[in-house]
């Protein structure tokens, strides 16, 4: 057991030598009301401070009781600056005889991954090409302008309306990928400028909330495809995913829906409804319930601009229908792209793997091409993006060969597939999970 375990959070007066702890004790502090974590062998009590964590209390809580060094380094740009917030939370360090990593984390893989990140830094792969992002923003604004021009010049017949809807859905999808860049702090050196532009892109160009996205998306990056930690696999009993969940549902005789047909009803309620029905409602309610008035103001500016532009063409009701049709189209694009990298991979309880292994277990890539890069917002390089979330996306292909080499060295599978195959695999994965559920439901 550790020594000095009663020392409170935020203590500024410490006796020498610093209290030491064993992993056995640290791992007990993994509750919502009792959170310790380890960074660079230092032990921190983040119980109270997690409520003030800019990235949200959940993401920091997902690493309670374990080493969070690589996650800490992956998410933050200025380690010296954020390190100042950790100092008052320091309560001790690992005992000298304790390994730096806990449980299923590989020290050799971790050492090699950190060397790889240093190589990426030496290659200037975290340096931004600002012209690239300017052109991305510009082509979004051009599409927004083109949509207005089409209706102004050709009128509001069915064909101009459909063409305009597809143009605006494309603009929304591309704005979604662009806000993702700023949300990950991968454009500017200073976090503040990333945050400011992020609010503009996700708020004014899309009508969504930066804080809602941050709190949700960083959990996904911290613990991808981990039940009870990754919100992206929280399916609200609509789907059963992976192998563990369908077996659990089957054994417990849970049948909220006929999951053996989920690969069929996915087409009806997955891609069509996620954004217009679920996300749109959840985002608005989250901003109101959390009194996030800044994000709400940005979102309102989007809706004001949209209705000011399109009510003269369609009237109030028509503009509302037009908006939701655009969301409907965008939702298909968003769901297929975001699920092709993760849904087909391992989805399970937390095995407490090291950063590199955990990201590779939950992530696969899609082959590179100019279209695939544009269509997916470079999320076809999802493996590299998950390993280095602050790396500008135009550099992800440059680090990919080195990631492949590291995978080969340690016998870790690096999955990369054609775009069509990746999309088909989504349906195949749902079908497989549904069959596992049915077998367990009937026979176990």
UniProtKB/Swiss-Prot annotation:
Induction / repression: Induced by dietary PUFA-deficient diet. Induced by a fat-free diet and by a diet containing triolein (18:1n-9) as the only fat source. Down-regulated in liver by dietary PUFA.
Position of sequence motif Histidine box-3: 382-386
Transmembrane annotation, as ranges: 131-151, 153-173, 265-285, 306-326
Topological domains, Cytoplasmic: 1-130, 174-264, 327-444
Disulfide partners: none
Keywords assigned: Electron transport, Endoplasmic reticulum, Fatty acid biosynthesis, Fatty acid metabolism, Lipid biosynthesis, Lipid metabolism, Membrane, Oxidoreductase, Transmembrane, Transmembrane helix, Transport
Membrane topology: Multi-pass membrane protein
InterPro entries: Cyt_B5-like_heme/steroid-bd, Cyt_B5-like_heme/steroid_sf, FA_desaturase_dom, Fatty_acid_desaturase
Tissue specificity note: Highly expressed in the adrenal gland, liver, brain, and testis, tissues where lipogenesis and steroidogenesis are active. Also detected in lung, heart, and skeletal muscle.
Gene3D superfamilies linked: Cytochrome b5-like heme/steroid binding domain
EC number of the protein: 1.14.19.3
Residue ranges, annotated region (Disordered): 1-21
GO CC annotation terms, alphabetical: endoplasmic reticulum membrane; membrane
Gene Ontology BP terms: alpha-linolenic acid metabolic process; arachidonate metabolite production involved in inflammatory response; fatty acid biosynthetic process; fatty acid derivative biosynthetic process; linoleic acid metabolic process; long-chain fatty acid biosynthetic process; positive regulation of cellular response to oxidative stress; unsaturated fatty acid biosynthetic process
Catalytic activity: (9Z,12Z)-octadecadienoyl-CoA + 2 Fe(II)-[cytochrome b5] + O2 + 2 H(+) = (6Z,9Z,12Z)-octadecatrienoyl-CoA + 2 Fe(III)-[cytochrome b5] + 2 H2O; (9Z,12Z,15Z)-octadecatrienoyl-CoA + 2 Fe(II)-[cytochrome b5] + O2 + 2 H(+) = (6Z,9Z,12Z,15Z)-octadecatetraenoyl-CoA + 2 Fe(III)-[cytochrome b5] + 2 H2O; (9Z,12Z,15Z,18Z,21Z)-tetracosapentaenoyl-CoA + 2 Fe(II)-[cytochrome b5] + O2 + 2 H(+) = (6Z,9Z,12Z,15Z,18Z,21Z)-tetracosahexaenoyl-CoA + 2 Fe(III)-[cytochrome b5] + 2 H2O; (11E)-octadecenoyl-CoA + 2 Fe(II)-[cytochrome b5] + O2 + 2 H(+) = (6Z,11E)-octadecadienoyl-CoA + 2 Fe(III)-[cytochrome b5] + 2 H2O
Keyword Endoplasmic reticulum (UniProt): yes
MF annotations from Gene Ontology: acyl-CoA 6-desaturase activity; acyl-CoA desaturase activity; stearoyl-CoA 9-desaturase activity
PROSITE patterns: CYTOCHROME_B5_2 (PS50255)
Motif (Histidine box-2): 217-221
Domain Cytochrome b5 heme-binding span(s) in chain numbering: 18-95
Pathway listed: Lipid metabolism; polyunsaturated fatty acid biosynthesis
Motif (Histidine box-1): 180-184
Function of the molecule: Involved in the biosynthesis of highly unsaturated fatty acids (HUFA) from the essential polyunsaturated fatty acids (PUFA) linoleic acid (LA) (18:2n-6) and alpha-linolenic acid (ALA) (18:3n-3) precursors, acting as a fatty acyl-coenzyme A (CoA) desaturase that introduces a cis double bond at carbon 6 of the fatty acyl chain. Catalyzes the first and rate limiting step in this pathway which is the desaturation of LA (18:2n-6) and ALA (18:3n-3) into gamma-linoleate (GLA) (18:3n-6) and stearidonate (18:4n-3), respectively.
PANTHER family attached to this UniProt entry: ACYL-COA 6-DESATURASE (PTHR19353:SF12), FATTY ACID DESATURASE 2 (PTHR19353)
Family: Belongs to the fatty acid desaturase type 1 family.
Listed name of the protein: Acyl-CoA 6-desaturase
The species this protein was found in: Mus musculus (Mouse)
Lineage per the UniProt record: Eukaryota, Metazoa, Chordata, Craniata, Vertebrata
Gene name for this UniProt entry: Fads2
């Amino acid at each position: 057991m550790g020594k000095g375990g009663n020392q409170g959070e935020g203590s500024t007066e410490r006796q020498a030598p610093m209290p030491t702890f064993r992993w056995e004790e640290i791992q007990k502090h993994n509750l919502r009301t009792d959170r310790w974590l380890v960074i660079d062998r230092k032990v921190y009590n983040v119980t109270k401070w997690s409520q003030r964590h800019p990235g949200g209390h959940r993401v920091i809580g997902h690493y309670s009781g374990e080493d969070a060094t690589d996650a800490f380094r992956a998410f933050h740009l200025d380690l010296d600056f954020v390190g100042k917030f950790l100092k008052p939370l320091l309560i001790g360090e690992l005992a000298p005889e304790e390994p730096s990593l806990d449980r299923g984390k590989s020290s050799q893989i971790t050492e090699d991954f950190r060397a790889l990140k240093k190589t990426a830094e030496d290659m200037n792969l975290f340096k931004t090409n600002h012209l690239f992002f300017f052109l991305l923003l510009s082509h979004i604004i051009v599409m927004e302008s083109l949509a207005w021009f089409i209706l102004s010049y050709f009128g509001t017949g069915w064909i101009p309306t459909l063409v305009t809807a597809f143009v605006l859905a494309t603009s929304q999808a591309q704005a979604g990928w662009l806000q993702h860049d700023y949300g990950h702090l991968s454009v500017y050196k200073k976090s503040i400028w990333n945050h400011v532009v992020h609010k503009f892109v996700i708020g004014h160009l899309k009508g969504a909330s930066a804080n809602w996205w941050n709190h949700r998306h960083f959990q996904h990056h911290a613990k991808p495809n981990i039940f009870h930690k990754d919100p992206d696999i929280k399916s609200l009993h609509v789907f059963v995913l992976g192998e563990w969940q369908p077996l659990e549902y089957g054994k417990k005789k849970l049948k909220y829906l006929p999951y053996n047909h989920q690969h069929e009803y996915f087409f009806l309620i997955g891609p069509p409804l996620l954004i217009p029905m679920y996300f749109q409602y959840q985002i608005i309610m989250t901003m109101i319930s959390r009194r996030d008035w800044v994000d709400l103001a940005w979102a309102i500016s989007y809706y004001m601009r949209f209705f000011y532009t399109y009510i003269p063409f369609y009237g109030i009701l028509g503009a509302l229908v037009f908006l939701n049709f655009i969301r409907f189209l965008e939702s298909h694009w968003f769901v297929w792209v975001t699920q092709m990298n993760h849904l087909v991979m391992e989805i399970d309880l937390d095995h407490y793997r090291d950063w590199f292994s955990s990201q590779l277990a939950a992530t696969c890539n899609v082959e590179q091409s100019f279209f695939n890069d544009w269509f997916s917002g470079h999320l076809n390089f999802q493996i590299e993006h998950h390993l280095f979330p602050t790396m500008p996306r135009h550099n992800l292909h440059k680090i990919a060969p080195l990631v492949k080499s590291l995978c080969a060295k340690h016998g870790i599978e690096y999955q990369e597939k054609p775009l069509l195959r990746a999309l088909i695999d989504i349906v195949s994965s749902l079908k497989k999970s549904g069959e596992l559920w049915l077998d367990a439901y009937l026979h176990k």
